[in-house]
Regions:
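Short, small/hydrophobic-residue-rich motifs at membrane-helix boundaries and re-entrant hairpins
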Residues: 1-83, 89-133, 137-243, 251, ...
Length: 322
């Protein structure tokens, strides 16, 4: 038996909230871009740097304040087996968690970051419920730190060193390479970066979703590391080679793969598995069409785009009982 998801977002009701967030967000993004270029000059003053930090803080505050109301709309639009999810997050509580997390991350030079993100995930998942039963997140910050170290920090060290040696403005004795050799080194670095990022995406997905709990039900993933990373890597490479045109198809194929390898278990017994039946060609046209409509309307159409894209993905996602 297949039980299906659905997404029933009312775009007209979501529009006022979206516009209230999007316009200030866009203004702050432009101001930050302009101010950051000013601070890059040799004559940048302390006041200009302070103004940039103030703008970044304002953007952070805006995002945090609107995050909960937006999630409340989006989560309540998700249905499973004709029953809606509910979200009971509080702006004050969420703002406090972020403020404390940012403070501790700064004074620990970023070391606390994984525990900060874990607390945010635990809170957001914990205030989400289905059929009056709350979900639970059991992920650990130490595990997330290990993921960051193994998939981002350590692999990026040689790439940064090579880039530094190639740049004459940074290195006192840059490597003597001809233009072709420099190009090949940059290409190799890019391919390695794709591999690193693919491993990071795999590890983050596994860390988050396999730590979700709903009553006695847990999610598990029956795929191995290298096949998963290889698939993500190939899709990223194709997106790069096509200058981003292929990106929607890449996203759909990765989503199909991740959903198809996700199982629901109860006490080590498989109860069901997820699946996705959406056609790549249909999704490719939908994603590009909705993206272009949002762009030409300067973002005003975005709520309708979110409603249509969300409905297509979720209505084609199902749970098949074992």
């Amino acid at each position: 038996m297949k039980r299906e998801f659905d997404f029933q977002l009312d775009a007209k009701r979501f529009l006022p909230l979206f516009v209230s967030f999007f316009i200030p967000w866009l203004i702050l993004e432009v101001l930050i871009l302009v101010q950051s270029r000013r601070t890059e000059t040799a004559t940048a003053s302390t006041a200009s740097i302070f103004l940039l930090l103030l703008l970044v803080a304002a953007l952070f505050g805006l995002t945090v304040l609107f995050y909960i109301p937006i999630l409340r709309k989006l989560v309540s639009a998700v249905f499973f087996n004709n029953e809606p999810f509910h979200f009971e997050g509080l702006i004050g509580r969420f703002f406090g968690l972020n403020l404390l997390g940012i403070f501790l991350s700064v004074i620990t030079l970023g070391i606390y970051g994984p525990w900060y993100l874990t607390r945010i995930c635990r809170y957001l998942v914990g205030v989400t419920s289905y059929k009056e039963q709350h979900l639970e997140f059991t992920g650990k910050g130490g595990r997330l730190l290990l993921i960051f170290l193994l998939t981002i920090a350590i692999p990026m060290i040689p790439l940064v060193l090579v880039q530094t040696r190639l740049d004459p403005t940074i290195s006192a004795s840059p490597l003597a390479v001809n233009p072709f050799q420099a190009f090949m080194l940059q290409l190799l670095a890019l391919l390695i970066f794709f591999s690193v990022f693919a491993a990071y995406l795999y590890a983050i997905y596994r860390w988050f979703f396999t730590n979700l709990r709903y009553g006695d039900k847990v999610l598990s993933w029956n795929s191995r590391f290298w096949p998963s990373v290889s698939l993500i890597w190939v899709q990223m490479l194709l997106s790069f080679l096509t200058l981003g045109i292929y990106l929607p198809a890449a996203y759909i194929k990765v989503y199909r793969y991740l959903a198809g390898h996700t199982e629901i278990q109860t006490e080590q017994k498989q109860e069901g598995r997820l699946g996705f039946r959406g056609q790549t060609g249909r999704g490719f046209g939908l994603l590009w069409g909705q993206t272009l409509l949002s762009a030409v309307t300067l973002g005003v159409y975005a709520p309708w785009a979110m409603a249509k894209v969300g409905k297509w993905f979720l209505s084609n996602t199902y749970v098949e009982s074992s």
